Amino acid sequence: VLTAEDRRLLQASVGKLGCRLEDIGADALNRLLITFPQSKTYFSHFNLSPGSKDIIHQGEKVGKALDSALKHLDDIRGTLSQLSDLHAYNLRVDPVNFQLLSKCIHVSLATHLRNEYSASVTLAWDKFLELVADVLSEKYR
């Protein structure tokens, strides 16, 4: 459960990023494909070269979804419902990949925020990303 302090820390850290969440999403997706090559199976029709336009475009979608979820924390399930349907019913993405991507998002955030990515900020993001992964995985049940 995200506390009021978690919400405050999330919003404050986004304001300190110095880039858009779309850039974080693109960086994180690039890291995912390099670090966890098994995730490439979902992107066989993409140019999977690091930094390719396909990866950047898809990563920007990840960032936009995170931004939308952050703006609608009180209705995160409703906000991500269509995305959850897409991943469960059409793309059939193994839910473990949401956890792997979360790890990569943490690295991207830490890279951009540096000293601002304190233990409390890390915990707030961890709770948020866990919630997002849970919402995206719930249609699999």
Curated annotation (Swiss-Prot):
Q: Name one GO cellular component term.
A: hemoglobin complex
Can you give the residue ranges of the Globin domain?
Answer: 1-141
Q: Where does heme b bind?
A: H57, H87
Q: Which Gene3D superfamilies match?
A: Globins (1.10.490.10)
Found in which tissues? Red blood cells.
Q: What is this protein called?
A: Hemoglobin subunit alpha-D
Q: Which function does this protein serve?
A: Involved in oxygen transport from the lung to the various peripheral tissues.
- By its UniProt entry, which Pfam families does this protein fall under? Globin
GO MF, one term, reads:
heme binding
- How does it associate, per the subunit comment? The deoxy-Hb is a heterotetramer of two alpha and two beta chains, but oxygenation results in dissociation to dimers.
Instruction: Give the matching InterPro entries.
Output: Globin, Globin-like_sf, Globin/Proto, Hemoglobin_a-typ, Hemoglobin_oxygen_transport
Q: Which domain of life is it from?
A: Eukaryota
Alphabetical GO biological process terms: hydrogen peroxide catabolic process
- What's this protein's family per the entry? Belongs to the globin family.
Keywords associated with the record? Heme, Iron, Metal-binding, Oxygen transport, Transport
